[in-house]
């Protein structure tokens, strides 16, 4: 019986995936397209965890000249059907740098990580360099300084171009340069407050490695964003940018419908096709329908072990979420209103800036939508030409991303509401002042973003959040009591003095809000919700019925309150 291939979670080394008999979604024809492109430098921009590192690893193993052949890795792969392209296999020196680990809280710490990356790449080529009679003594000394991490700070600005020159001399062949997640250090520096220092370092390295490097055969870079206004790519005449808006290479990153269907069939999970589409599909790369590969693989691995495993957001821990949440939490009222509409399924229309920079996000509100699009939080559903510019219509791609937006809103709400002094509000609850309670809740509702597709859950979470921190009391939510489920109980922690019952209803119109508050109060009585409190010997029971209609509320005190 043939061994079932492993699902490769977090494995970004192409050789390891093949050697360990992991399931591999064949993207090798990307190599053919790369050779046909004729570009000196090509930049792929895709969201985080969309297979960029794995694809660059595949490119490295294809082109790199090594002592032991790696040609077997491409046996029976799509590229093997093209002998004219297989002739390029194992023919070039390759420099591979992944900057995704440069996420430290200070520039100094990030620079130390960069030095480690340079050291590792020099070590990887040390044998070839020192065994060659083509390397001058002064250059060998400089190589040693990089390996020992004793090079001058200024020398690191040209470290990549220096290594490419040495390798080109050793192999008598120009170098292929691969730089993965080039903008992670910039994103991190933006979030941590040392953006200018980092952009100066990256600019210096790229200028020497990509613009004025006569030893370069071609370069491939990956990242989320195209950062050009800081002059990283200025003057690079033969730069080809392939963003999510371009048709070129549109299926090279992420999984197509066909690839997902084949994988589900392989693991006997075809019945999950509709669910996985709802949760993890929805991306539109150059008009191609694309699934999030990280989330799809994680779910397939989980479901392969337990077919009843629930769908969950696997992508929520990506680094860009920190900035997305910050953008939403710190945005103006107009932006919050648009986010609210997005969550409720209403598209946003905006011009898109392909060269948006992290430094511009705070000062240009239009850049927010560009950032959200390129980092995977929006997808294009339509575009039209307006005043010779492209106006894009965008929506949230799938349920997984929708949940991330909702979590951001909860965080925003918590920060703003919980920072207020709520003692007067709590006092109003105990003093049975329904009008005052209504006023507080109404004001808070007006300030927060709402989403209404799961109305009761939203308002339930809203009020539970408001009531958290009620000193001397604890919030108990959604439990069986009497003949049914109540919405919220507030119980005194000491002495079993006071218990408070909240029941919510959604009113279809503003005019019916009082009626629905009465219905909520009647439900408390009909279902005997107070039974649990009576059993626990609470001496005083207060009952509130609350109706909600979007950002309006109506609070009513039960006449049967003690």
Residue ranges and their predicted role:
Residues 1-455, 470-472:
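Phosphate-binding site recognition
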């Amino acid at each position: 019986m043939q061994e079932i291939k492993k699902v490769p979670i977090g494995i970004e080394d192409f050789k390891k995936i093949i050697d360990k008999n992991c399931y591999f979604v064949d993207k090798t024809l990307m190599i053919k397209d790369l050779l046909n492109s004729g570009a000196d430098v090509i930049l792929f921009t895709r969201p985080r965890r969309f297979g960029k590192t794995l694809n660059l690893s595949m490119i490295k193993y294809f082109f790199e000249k090594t002592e032991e052949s790696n040609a077997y890795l491409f046996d029976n792969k799509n590229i093997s059907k093209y002998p004219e392209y297989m002739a390029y296999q194992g023919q070039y020196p390759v420099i591979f740098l992944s900057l995704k680990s440069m996420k430290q809280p200070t520039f100094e710490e990030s620079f130390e990580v960069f030095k480690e990356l340079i050291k590792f790449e020099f070590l990887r080529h040390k044998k070839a360099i020192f065994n060659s009679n083509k390397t001058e003594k002064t250059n060998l000394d400089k190589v040693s300084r990089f390996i020992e991490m004793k090079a001058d700070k200024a020398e690191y600005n040209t470290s990549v171009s220096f290594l490419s020159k040495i390798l080109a001399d050793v192999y008598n062949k120009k170098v292929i340069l691969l730089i993965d997640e080039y903008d992670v250090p910039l994103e991190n520096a933006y979030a941590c407050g040392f953006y200018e220092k980092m952009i100066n370092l990256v600019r210096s390295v790229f200028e020497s490695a990509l613009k004025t490097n006569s030893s370069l055969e071609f370069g491939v870079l990956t990242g989320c964003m195209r950062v050009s206004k800081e002059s990283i790519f200025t003057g690079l005449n033969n730069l080809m940018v392939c963003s999510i808006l371009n048709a070129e290479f549109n299926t090279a990153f992420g999984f197509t419908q066909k690839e997902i269907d084949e994988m589900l069939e392989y693991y006997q999970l075809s019945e999950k096709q509709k669910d996985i589409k709802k949760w993890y599909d929805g991306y539109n790369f150059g008009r191609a329908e694309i699934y999030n590969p990280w989330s799809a693989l994680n779910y397939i691995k989980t479901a392969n072990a337990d077919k009843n495993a629930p769908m969950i957001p696997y992508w929520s821990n990506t680094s860009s979420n920190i900035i997305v949440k910050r953008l939403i939490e710190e945005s103006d009222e107009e932006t919050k209103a648009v986010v609210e509409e997005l969550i409720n399924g209403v598209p946003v229309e905006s011009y898109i800036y392909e060269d948006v920079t992290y430094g511009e996000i705070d000062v240009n509100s239009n850049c927010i939508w560009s950032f959200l699009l390129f980092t995977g939080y929006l997808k294009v559903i339509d575009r039209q030409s307006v005043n010779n510019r492209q106006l894009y219509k965008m929506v949230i791609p799938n349920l997984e991303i929708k949940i991330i937006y909702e979590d951001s809103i909860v965080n925003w709400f918590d920060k703003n509401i919980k920072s207020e002094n709520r003692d007067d509000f709590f006092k109003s609850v105990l003093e049975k002042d329904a009008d005052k309670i209504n006023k507080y809740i109404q004001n808070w509702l007006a300030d927060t973003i709402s989403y209404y597709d799961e109305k009761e859950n939203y308002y339930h979470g809203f009020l539970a959040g408001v009531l958290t921190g009620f000193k001397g009391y604890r919030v108990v939510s959604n439990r069986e009591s009497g003949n049914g489920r109540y919405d919220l109980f507030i119980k005194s922690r000491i002495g079993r003095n006071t218990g408070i019952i909240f029941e919510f209803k959604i009113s279809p119109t503003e005019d019916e809000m009082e009626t629905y508050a009465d219905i909520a109060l009647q439900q408390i009585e009909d279902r005997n919700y107070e039974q649990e409190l009576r059993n626990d010997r609470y001496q005083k029971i207060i009952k509130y019925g609350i109706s909600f209609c979007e950002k309006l509320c109506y609070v009513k005190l039960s006449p049967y309150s003690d």
